[in-house]
Amino acid sequence: MRETPELWTCERQAAAEGFAAVCGVDEAGAGPLMGPVYAAAVILPEDCDLPELNDSKKLTEKKREKLFPLIQEQAVAWSVARVEASEIDETDILSARMKAMQLALDGLSVTPDLALIDGNRDKGHSAAITTVHRCIVGGDGISASIAAASVLAKVSRDRYVTEILDKAYPQYQFARHKGYGTKLHYEMLDKYGPCPEHRRSFLKKWEAKR
C-alpha cells in the first residue's frame, strides 16, 4: 500500500535511468544541543507494503514506531549509524552529518547503485559521500526510500535518548525534550551545567550569558 504515488517519484525516475538498487539516506538529530547525530540508509523493494509512510517529521511518534519494524522487515537492506557529540565538537555538525550518512551507506548488506540524499548538500559538502548519489531537496516527500530512512534515523535516535541518555543523566529530563533547546532544557543546563553528552559547540551563546 503506497499512501501517495508521488512518494515514489525519485525511485521511478532512477529505475527509468537504469539504476537497480536505489538507496534513500536521511539523518536525525542535527539540531539538538546534545547527543549523537544519526543517519539511516534504506533500499526498498518495489512491492513493499508500508501504510502511511511519509517524512518522519510529518508522522506521530506512534506511527513512526509502527513503521520502524515494518521497514526493517521489508527492506532489501537497511543500516543505521551515528556520530557522537564529541566528534561533532571536534569537527562541525555538517561534517558529522556527512560522516554518519557514509557510515550508514557502508553498513548496507547490498551495495546501492545510487543513493538519494535528502536536502541540498551539493555545495561541495556532499563530496564526503563516496557512493554515487544525488541530493534531493524535499526528498522525504518524493522518495519512499528517503522517507523510510528518515523514520529509521528518527526512531533510532529518540530511543537512544530516552532509553540510554535519559537514564544516564536523569536530571536533564532528556526524554521530555529529546535534547532540543527548549525552555526546560536550558533551565536544567542553568541548574546542573553541561554533561559529557552536550555539544559544547552548540552552547556558546548559553555559556556567554553565564
Language model features with spans:
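RNase H-like, Mg2+-dependent phosphodiesterase core
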Residues: M1-R210
